[in-house]
């Protein structure tokens, strides 16, 4: 059996008279239906009355949900010309080097299919699709306020523009806009341009300069340039072997524009071969793409063989360790080596080699770091392919330093040993450092359903226990120095509203002090408030409150001192550093420096 005690795990599946799946049980050890202490140990679904076999209701396990009617309900509707079921009609078309967005008002009633999904806590989402099945609009309701995300297509059915909620709120007129000139689209929209073969050649993300893409005749990405690359006058380039595997990625200084590159590669198939010595500028590969000598390879990858080892003494050769398997000479289809350069100093490179056994498993990885340190990793597997021992060896290149510091040692070995139960679950982890005694890092315990219920750390000095509800949601963490309980909808403290969709209603934390934190959410499942209480239900501080814009960015945080900290982390070009003063439980006040990096156009 698959359970820790060797019992069989039974799964039950239910079907209706039309042979449609309608239910599935949780795993039951030896078929014991009372294992979970809940009569509703299964999930299920209910179909609509139409012949389309559409599911109108799904429910998960748990009496707390089923007895309270807490399921996910789906209604299948058609659009209307007003209200929550209305949908704006957008389309996109090319306009030279620009994409034009055109709004033609609203779709006429009955033109679109609408699915209205209501989760267990009454949160509503509408999805609008056309007769071709293309998703046009996702409308999430925060109470009565819609948050609309539109996907706009061209006449060929290609996705051209995505309008998130703030953009959708601004573009309400029956009009057209150029994506390169509209401030709203530049700030919030996602825009895509294609070539005649339906390949994306330009992508614009909110607030960013466009990313350009160039392909060869085989539709492989050859060049890419984002806004920062353009400012630096470089392109990212890619080279591939005959099987389409990326062999080189690097940067290429060039002022050539995308259109000129497209002409160069339009009829070219860029396929590189490894030919070894004589191609030092390309690390043993040919250069059919004819990139100039000013290019800087950043990652070079080798496959199928180890002929590349002759290119550099920095590649560490195979170390024969019979306990860790035997290598094969030609691991076909496998990544065998890499040269990885530092981005800020490409002259410094790490050389990595991977060795495989006859079952295609990595048994040895050797790396010479940018500083010249030698690192070896050896892996031993059991019959079914699980690692049972991992040995890591580190060798320094500074023996002279040991003369100055005789007590120091710069060569180390760490061995990790793993034990598993009969079902492949890890049960023990051991570590041996250098020649020290082997210690047990962790021991894991599972319940009969296979869930982790306990973890003992460092030879039994630290014991952690975990508990779950019937849906597998974590409900308690019990450790020697703290206890945390997570409440959803069962055994709630007085005054806490139950939540059924997976949001946490209350957290109890006990360490030096004990406290409850009652959590509130908006209609989009965003945390809006956290109120702290003592275990006796007495408020200890004002609630922390959070507000958001329609993009999901935090716009303000109200902290226990009742001071508002304005949050600018996602606003372009406004502010980099925010010092937010606040008091913690009204005991003392401190300033928290919060760093936000501006997005670069």
What are the language-model segments listed below?
Residues 1-601:
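Beta-strand elements of repeat-based all-beta scaffolds
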């Amino acid at each position: 059996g698959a359970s820790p005690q060797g019992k069989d795990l039974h799964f039950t599946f239910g079907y209706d008279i039309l042979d449609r799946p309608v239910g599935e049980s949780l795993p039951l050890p030896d078929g014991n239906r009372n294992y979970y202490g809940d009569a509703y140990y299964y999930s299920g679904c209910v179909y609509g009355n139409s012949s389309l076999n559409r599911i109108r209701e799904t429910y998960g396990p748990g009496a707390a949900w089923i007895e309270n009617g807490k399921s996910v309900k789906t209604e299948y509707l058609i659009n209307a010309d007003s209200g929550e079921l209305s949908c704006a009609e957008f389309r996109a078309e090319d306009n030279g080097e620009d994409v034009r967005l055109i709004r033609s008002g609203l779709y006429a009633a009955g033109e679109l299919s609408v699915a209205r999904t209501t989760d267990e806590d009454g949160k509503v989402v509408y999805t609008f699709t056309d007769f071709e099945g293309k998703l046009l609009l996702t409308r999430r309701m925060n109470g009565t306020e819609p948050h609309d995300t539109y996907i706009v297509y061209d006449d060929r059915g290609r996705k051209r523009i995505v309008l998130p909620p703030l953009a959708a709120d601004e573009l309400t007129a029956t009009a057209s806009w150029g994506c390169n000139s509209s401030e709203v689209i530049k700030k919030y929209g996602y825009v895509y341009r294609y070539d005649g073969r339906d390949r994306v050649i330009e992508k614009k993300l909110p607030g960013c300069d466009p990313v350009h893409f160039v392909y060869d005749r085989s539709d492989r990405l050859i060049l890419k340039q984002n806004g920062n690359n353009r400012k630096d006058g470089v392109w990212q380039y890619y080279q591939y072997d005959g099987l389409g595997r990326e062999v080189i990625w690097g940067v290429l200084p060039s002022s050539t524009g995308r259109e000129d590159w497209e002409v160069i590669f339009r009829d070219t198939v860029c396929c590189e071969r490894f030919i070894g010595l004589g191609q030092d500028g390309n690390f043993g590969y040919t250069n059919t793409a004819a990139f100039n000598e000013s290019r800087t390879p950043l990652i070079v990858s080798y496959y199928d063989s180890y002929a590349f080892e002759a290119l550099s003494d920095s590649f560490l050769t195979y170390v024969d360790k019979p306990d860790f398997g035997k290598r094969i000479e030609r691991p076909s289809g496998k990544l065998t080596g890499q040269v990885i350069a530092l981005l800020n100093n490409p002259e410094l490179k790490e050389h990595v080699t991977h060795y495989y056994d006859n079952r295609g498993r990595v048994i040895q990885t050797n790396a010479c770091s940018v500083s010249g340190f030698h690192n070896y990793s050896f892996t031993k597997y059991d019959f079914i392919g699980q690692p049972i021992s991992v040995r890591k060896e580190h060798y320094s290149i500074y023996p002279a330093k040991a003369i100055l510091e005789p007590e120091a040692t710069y060569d180390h070995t760490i061995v990790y040993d793993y034990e598993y139960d009969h079902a492949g679950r890890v049960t023990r982890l051991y570590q041996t450092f250098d020649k020290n005694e082997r210690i047990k890092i962790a021991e894991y315990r599972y319940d009969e359903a296979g869930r982790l219920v306990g973890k003992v750390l460092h030879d039994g000095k630290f014991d952690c226990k975990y508990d779950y509800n019937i849906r597998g949601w974590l409900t308690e963490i019990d450790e020697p120095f703290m206890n945390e309980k997570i409440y959803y909808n069962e055994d709630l403290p007085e005054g806490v509203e139950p939540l059924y969709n997976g949001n946490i209603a209350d957290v109890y934390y006990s360490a030096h002090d004990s406290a409850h934190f009652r959590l509130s959410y908006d209609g989009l499942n965003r945390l809006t408030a956290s109120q702290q209480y003592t275990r006796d239900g007495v408020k200890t501080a004002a609630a922390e409150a959070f507000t958001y814009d329609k993009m999901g960015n935090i716009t303000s945080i109200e902290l226990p001192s009742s001071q508002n900290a304005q949050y600018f982390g996602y606003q372009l070009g406004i502010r980099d550093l925010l010092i937010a003063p606040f008091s913690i439980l009204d005991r003392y006040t401190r300033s928290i420096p919060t760093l936000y990096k501006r997005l670069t156009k």
